[in-house]
C-alpha cells in the first residue's frame, strides 16, 4: 500500500534513526515513494510539511539528530513524516500524547482539516477529548469492540463499559 496508508507511531523517540539527521530521514521517507522528485522539490515539500505542523525553525530542525529535539517536536515531525507522501489513510496511534494541551488542540484541528480534504484518519487514542473530534467512535476493551457510533455515544452510552469509561473522566459534551 506504500504511500496510500501511512502510520504515525506512538513513540517518536524509538521511531527515528538516532544516527541520521531529521532532514535526511524526512527526505528519505519522501524519496522512497517519489523517486522522480527533484532535490529542490523534495526540500520544498519537507519544509512546507513541517511548517504546516507549526514548526518554524526549519534549519535547526532539519540539521538536528532526534535526541536533540523535544518529545513534542519529535511527535510533530513524526506526523510530518506520515503526511509528506499525502496518504489517503492515516493511522494515528496516540499521535497527540507527547504534545502539550495547547498544541494538542491545534494539531487535532489540523488533522480534522486533513479529513475534510479527503484523507481518512484512524485515530487510536485513550484520550476521550481527542476522540470526541472524530466522526465515528469505536469503544474497545481488551481488543474487543464494545460499542460503535457517532459522538452521540458520549451523551447516550448504551454499554456498561462505555458508561464506566465516561464516568472516569470529565468530558465537555457536544
Could you tell me what each predicted segment is?
Residues 84-88:
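A short, proline-enriched helix->beta-strand linker immediately N-terminal to the Walker B motif
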Residues 64-69, 73:
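Conserved ABC ATPase signature
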Residues 79, 107:
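Hydrophobic anchor residue at the start of the ABC signature
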Residues 90-93:
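Catalytic Walker B motif of ABC-type/P-loop ATPase nucleotide-binding domains
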Residues 132-139:
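Conserved catalytic segment of ABC-fold P-loop ATPases
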Residues 140, 152-174:
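C-terminal boundary and immediately downstream tail of ABC-type ATPase nucleotide-binding domains
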Amino acid at each position: 500500500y506504500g504511500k496510500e496508508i501511512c502510520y504515525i507511531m506512538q513513540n517518536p523517540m524509538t521511531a527515528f534513526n538516532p544516527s541520521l539527521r531529521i532532514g535526511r530521514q524526512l527526505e528519505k521517507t519522501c524519496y522512497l515513494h517519489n523517486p522522480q522528485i527533484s532535490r529542490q522539490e523534495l526540500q520544498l515539500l519537507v519544509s512546507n510539511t513541517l511548517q504546516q505542523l507549526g514548526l518554524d525553525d526549519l534549519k535547526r530542525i532539519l540539521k538536528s539528530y532526534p535526541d536533540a529535539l523535544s518529545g513534542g517536536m519529535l511527535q510533530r515531525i513524526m506526523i510530518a513524516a506520515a503526511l509528506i507522501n499525502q496518504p489517503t489513510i492515516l493511522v494515528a496511534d496516540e499521535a497527540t500524547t507527547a504534545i502539550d494541551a495547547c498544541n494538542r488542540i491545534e494539531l487535532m484541528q489540523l488533522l480534522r482539516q486533513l479529513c475534510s480534504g479527503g484523507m481518512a484518519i484512524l485515530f487510536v487514542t485513550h484520550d476521550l477529548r481527542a476522540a470526541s473530534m472524530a466522526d465515528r467512535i469505536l469503544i474497545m476493551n481488551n481488543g474487543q469492540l464494545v460499542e460503535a457510533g457517532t459522538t452521540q455515544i458520549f451523551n447516550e452510552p448504551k454499554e456498561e463499559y462505555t458508561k464506566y469509561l465516561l464516568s472516569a473522566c470529565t468530558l465537555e459534551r457536544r
